[in-house]
A protein has these predicted regions:
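Catalytic cores of secreted/periplasmic lytic hydrolases that degrade extracellular macromolecules
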Residues: 2-185
């Protein structure tokens, strides 16, 4: 039943994306912005649905997907991997090893090779992200434990990602693309 709802929201997102090229041209957006707007249209409604059902901010979920996947353009986010959130490990026994950059917690980047989850579908990626945040380690990102999305992004900094400016980057994306509209139900 839930997969039917996710499929419906994916379809709604696809239909909504048909209007975005017209809107982006009117706003004189760059090609990068147009790519991001199309990516938001692809995952926005499903993210809204999943976030609402799981005490999360859809705006943060979408901003993380934009940042972690380069608006769905990174190698890791492409078919058949669909890892929009940079989640390491395995998903149903599936993973891929790729080079990545980490932050030592003091703003100094370093390179590692890491195994990342491979999902096989957009829906699996979004659903697994929600499940990934269910543990007590991420309790500070839940709506019921925060006053705003900014509290949630602050709770992710240094925890979800080693980047010491992670929350600031997410806040900037949320504001630039007005993602808080996805936090309403």
């Amino acid at each position: 039943m839930e997969s039917d709802f996710i499929g419906l929201f994916s379809l709604l997102g696809l239909l909504a994306s048909l209007n975005f090229p017209r809107l982006t041209m009117e706003k004189n957006m760059t090609p990068t912005d147009e790519t991001t707007v199309a990516f938001i249209a692809e995952i926005g409604e499903t993210s809204r649905y999943l976030a609402a059902r799981n005490d999360l901010y859809a705006s943060v979920m979408i901003a993380q997907a934009i940042l972690e996947s380069d608006s769905g353009q990174s190698q890791l986010s492409q078919k058949p991997l669909y890892n929009f959130f940079g989640i390491k490990g395995e998903y149903n026994g599936q993973s891929v090893t790729l080079p990545t950059w980490e932050d030592d917690g003091k703003g100094n980047p370093y390179h590692i090779d890491a195994a990342f989850r491979s999902y096989g579908s957009v829906e699996n990626s979004l659903q697994d992200y929600v499940e990934f945040l269910e543990g007590s380690y991420y309790v500070g990102v839940h709506r019921s434990k925060t006053r705003s999305y900014k509290d949630a992004t602050a709770a992710l900094t240094g925890v979800y990602a080693t980047d010491t400016t992670y929350g600031d980057k997410l806040n900037s994306i949320i504001e630039q693309y007005q993602l808080t509209i996805y936090d309403t139900y």
